[in-house]
Amino acid sequence: MLFNVSACDIRDKPMPSNNDINKIDQLERVKKVRKNSSQSEAGSSSSGNSSFVALVKASNLKEDALYLPQDCTSSNGLNKKCRKIFLTDGGDRSWEMDLKFDKNLDSFCITRGWRHFCDENGKKLPNQERFVTVRLVPDCLRNKRLYLSRRFLKNNGLGEPKMVTLVGTDGTRILANLLRESTGRMSLGRGWVDFAKANRLKIGEYFTLESIWENDSPILSLYGTNTSKSDKRKRRENFPVACEKEYVSTEARNRNEPEKDKNTEEMINQASLSENRLVITLVPEDVKAGMLRLPSHFMKANGIDKVGKIYMLGINEMEWWWGDLLTRDGIVSVGCGWRYFCESNGVKIGKSFTLECMYKYDTRPVFKFCPKSGK
């Protein structure tokens, strides 16, 4: 929403609501001030600070308040005595609103009337169906697939396989194909991993995509990222309301796994941080056998009591490796490519590395691989 600041009505006391004559006099005075102010700005101001763009957000609608940019208010003669302000629709209609100065933020704020002004002019929040929030998990990179909500795809005309343009925060565009699997689920395929790397998306991070169409071409634009699911206040400011409620599992569903284990996250207790790290020496015998051994006390301290996959993130948190925990005694099958993963992360045979248990995804532990032991 574009605002063009042209006048401010200065009042020390509220205008009596039962005095029609005073209302007319005040409105006439406002029109006169607006006219004189416009003439002086046209002659003396060329800085372009007489207008600014206001974003309609869930937060300012809920609070019925809008903070004005400091450079705009200072260049247009607003002072702390201003009590009322008029907003127009560019035509004959105008809305009178309260104006106050927030000392803590050193900014002017429109109060009591902002929500009504938005309703009257049809200014609403962006269409919530255009947004979807997903979490980057290791399988997204290993399988080179990003699974998206069926409802999101259907509501945005993406129900059929096609090429989609992915747009990063810096405007970089990468083509990706939207695929339909035999199960009916749809995902982003070729091009998705390059997009994740180009925008430095990290494992465990939440990010929001916005669906945009340009000349009949589908576009998914990176709207924002957030590393903490619990930081609700920050997400309310940056993401649409609907995005706070819908999280999409980005991993292909295994029919043998109980439904209750999906989409769960268990953060490691920070009080036992020292027990989250394990120093291991890369010995030739283990590399040849494709095995990794985790001590029982380490597994117990981190709540690892189920066999299954474990994930290890490289030093750049984009390259990763996974293995199968075969027994509760800590025997892990890491495969024949384990050696190359270690070497690519700066660890050769005979050297030590550190595994730090970061968190769990779907009850599966995720470790950070560090080339220097004890750090």
From Swiss-Prot:
The record places the DNA-binding region at 51-147, 131-226, 277-375
Q: Which PROSITE patterns match?
A: B3
Record-level GO cellular component terms: nucleus
Cellular localisation? Nucleus
Q: Which SMART domains match?
A: B3
Molecular function GO labels: DNA binding
Q: Which domain of life is it from?
A: Eukaryota
Its keywords, alphabetically, are: DNA-binding, Nucleus, Repeat, Transcription, Transcription regulation
Q: What is this protein called?
A: B3 domain-containing protein REM-like 2
Native source organism of the sequence: Arabidopsis thaliana (Mouse-ear cress)
- Recite the lineage of the species: Eukaryota, Viridiplantae, Streptophyta, Embryophyta, Tracheophyta
